[in-house]
Each structure stands twice: as structure tokens, then as C-alpha cells.
């Protein structure tokens, strides 16, 4: 009896992201992902079950990668303001391909109520609270909101932003940060 081939979930997730990047969120289906990954529909279903399971896996992988990037920039005792500052510096990295991938994943995330609710809860926990009562906290939060807004404008193609313009925007946003919020 032959051994069943093992499907690389990460390659299937990459194929799903490519489908969304190339064709839009409405094209995301088990069939399209299977075609892009070069496997059967059953292969995709055996990895993720349903389209919702596929989307959830896309978002979870992206979140884990993003959180690892942020945590790598932080000291073990970092607080919420340092966490936001690290995210601002990650957002400032001019990487058009990464922006497109993030936009694809965000579009997938926005297609599911449960994932949108998780994002809402995450942002609320990140941006509200006692740390933002001080002037320093307010400046860090404002810089984070500006960086996130610029990132969304660029990633979703709402505004074409050249590398030089992105650098200028990032420098402007960095000036919003308090002097003690150095680049991690």
C-alpha cells in the first residue's frame, strides 16, 4: 500500500494568499486554491475543512508571524506603549510585496464576522486604557493610528505611495513619537 502524500499547509496558505492578491477576495474558493496549489480540492479540504477554516488559518499564520516580528523588537518587560512603537517601526518598513500580502489577508479576515470581532477586540485592548492618559501615551497612540492609516491607504491601493513618499510619511509619523520612543 502506498503512503499518502503529505500536503504542505504553508504552501496551500501561500496559494490562497496569491489567489486573493491576484483575483480578489471574491475569487477565494477551495477550487481556486487547489488549482493554484496544484492539488485536489480534497487536498485543500483535508488541510482546512472549509473555506472559513482556510481563511482562519491564513489569518492565524499572519498574526503569528506579525507577533513574532513585534516581539523580536521588544524587551521582556515592555509595556503597551513600547508594543505600539515596535509596530509603528515595522509598519514603516517599505515593503510593497509585504503590504500586498497583508492587504490580501486583511481582506480575507474582513470577510468573516468572527475574525472581524477578534480584530476589534485586539485593537480595543491595544488602544484603550490607562497608558493613554499621559501625553506620551496619546502621542504613541496617535502615531500608531497614523501609521496604520497610511499602511491601509497603501496596502489597499487607495492611494499610490512611492518609496520616497513612504519614507517621508514614515519620518513624519516618527516625529509624532515622544523623544524616548526610539526605534527598537
For every predicted segment, state its role.
Residues 57, 64-103:
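Hydrophobic alpha-helical connector segments
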Residues 4, 75, 158-161:
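Pocket-edge positions in alpha/beta enzyme catalytic cores
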Residues 114-120, 124-184:
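Hydrophobic/aromatic-rich alpha-helical bundle segments in the mid-to-C-terminal region
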Residues 85-132:
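Short secondary-structure transition hinges
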Residues 11, 15, 19-53, 57:
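Helix-turn-helix
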Residues 1-7, 181-184:
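N-terminal intrinsically disordered/low-complexity leader segments
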Residues 15-23, 69, 146-153:
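Solvent-exposed, amphipathic alpha-helical segments
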Amino acid at each position: 500500500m502506498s503512503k499518502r502524500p503529505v500536503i504542505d499547509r504553508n504552501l496551500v496558505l501561500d496559494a490562497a494568499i496569491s489567489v486573493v492578491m491576484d483575483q480578489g477576495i471574491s475569487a477565494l474558493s477551495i477550487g481556486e486554491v487547489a488549482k493554484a496549489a496544484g492539488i485536489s480540492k480534497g487536498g485543500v479540504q483535508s488541510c482546512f475543512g472549509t473555506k472559513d477554516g482556510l481563511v482562519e488559518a491564513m489569518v492565524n499564520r499572519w498574526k503569528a508571524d506579525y507577533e513574532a516580528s513585534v516581539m523580536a523588537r521588544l524587551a521582556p518587560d515592555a509595556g503597551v506603549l513600547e508594543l505600539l512603537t515596535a509596530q509603528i517601526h515595522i509598519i514603516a518598513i517599505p515593503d510593497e510585496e509585504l503590504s500586498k500580502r497583508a492587504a490580501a489577508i486583511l481582506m480575507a479576515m474582513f470577510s468573516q464576522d468572527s475574525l472581524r470581532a477578534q480584530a476589534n477586540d485586539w485593537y480595543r485592548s491595544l488602544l484603550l486604557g490607562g497608558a493613554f492618559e499621559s501625553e506620551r501615551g496619546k502621542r504613541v497612540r496617535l502615531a500608531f493610528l497614523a501609521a496604520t492609516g497610511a499602511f491601509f491607504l497603501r496596502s489597499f491601493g487607495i492611494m499610490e505611495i512611492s518609496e520616497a513618499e513612504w519614507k517621508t510619511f514614515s519620518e513624519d509619523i516618527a516625529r509624532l513619537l515622544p523623544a524616548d520612543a526610539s526605534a527598537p
